[in-house]
Amino acid sequence: MALEAMNTPTSSFTRIETKEDLMNDAVFIEPWLKRKRSKRQRSHSPSSSSSSPPRSRPKSQNQDLTEEEYLALCLLMLAKDQPSQTRFHQQSQSLTPPPESKNLPYKCNVCEKAFPSYQALGGHKASHRIKPPTVISTTADDSTAPTISIVAGEKHPIAASGKIHECSICHKVFPTGQALGGHKRCHYEGNLGGGGGGGSKSISHSGSVSSTVSEERSHRGFIDLNLPALPELSLHHNPIVDEEILSPLTGKKPLLLTDHDQVIKKEDLSLKI
């Protein structure tokens, strides 16, 4: 369709007209370009000219300008368009209403922060509570009693009511009073360090008992040849000796004398007489 339209006589006629127009324009512009630059009078008030934007001149006056002046005028008009756009943008921003400030009735007395509800304020006040100081308690014997340490930056369990259950001996925090009571019982019984003199004495006593028991077990592991043999380990088993050892409070038993012993006894009696 486009090729057919171009081949029509009307299209060729319009093409010829455009060529003629271009020739006329070239003839008209050629003396205008070769002409010397005209000197025009400048206004004596530069402040008024700088403040007021350049006005568009009529068509006849624009034809008197040189090409350089016409381009400079176009650049000035383009430069004046940017502030107008920014001014319109600033006006649109100023027209937008500011965000409505929310009324927060609940205010913290410490840091002056406001909250919409009392529950939020209570949760915030929990962060202002004083944390227990850093405490490191050790005992004399590190092998028997453990070391208890509390770091200030550590999060301690706090009950829902907000009450802190802290041990007065080792400053350890517990969520409930029952847990604190069970922990204090360990201090009173001497199972944990830091419970006073009684706890340390009981720990030292238990350490000495354990050392004696370990010594007895070590002696049982081997036989000392310097010690006399035990009765149950003797080679010649004598039932009479065993009976005397087992029952030292038994009465006297009659001696069974042989004939030779009786003769010797009679001789001894005769000699005494």
From Swiss-Prot:
Cross-referenced SUPFAM superfamilies: beta-beta-alpha zinc fingers
Major place of residence: nucleus
Tissues in which the UniProt entry reports expression: Expressed in roots, radicles, cotyledons, hypocotyls, leaf veins, stems, sepals, petals, stamens, placenta, funiculi and maturated seeds.
Disrupted gene: phenotype observed: Delayed senescence and hypersensitivity to ABA during seed germination.
Presence of the UniProt keyword Aminoacyl-tRNA synthetase in the record: no
An individual GO BP term: negative regulation of DNA-templated transcription
Cysteines joined through disulfide linkages: none
Keyword field contains Transcription: yes
Induction comment from the UniProt entry of this chain: By abscisic acid (ABA), ethylene, salt, cold, dehydration and the monovalent and divalent cations Li(+), Na(+), K(+), Cs(+), Ca(2+) and Mg(2+).
Region of interest (Disordered), residue spans: 33-64, 195-215
Taxonomy, superkingdom: Eukaryota
Protein localization: Nucleus
Keywords: Abscisic acid signaling pathway, DNA-binding, Jasmonic acid signaling pathway, Metal-binding, Nucleus, Repeat, Repressor, Transcription, Transcription regulation, Zinc, Zinc-finger
Entry-linked Gene3D superfamilies: Classic Zinc Finger (3.30.160.60)
InterPro entries per record: AZF1/2/3-like, Znf_C2H2_sf, Znf_C2H2_type
Extent of Low complexity compositional bias: 44-54, 201-213
UniProt miscellaneous comment: Plants overexpressing AZF2 have increased sensitivity to salt stress and barely survive under high salt conditions.
Function: Transcriptional repressor involved in the inhibition of plant growth under abiotic stress conditions. Can repress the expression of various genes, including osmotic stress and abscisic acid-repressive genes and auxin-inducible genes, by binding to their promoter regions in a DNA sequence-specific manner. Acts as a negative regulator of abscisic acid (ABA) signaling during seed germination. Probably involved in jasmonate (JA) early signaling response.
Protein name: Zinc finger protein AZF2
Organism of derivation: Arabidopsis thaliana (Mouse-ear cress)
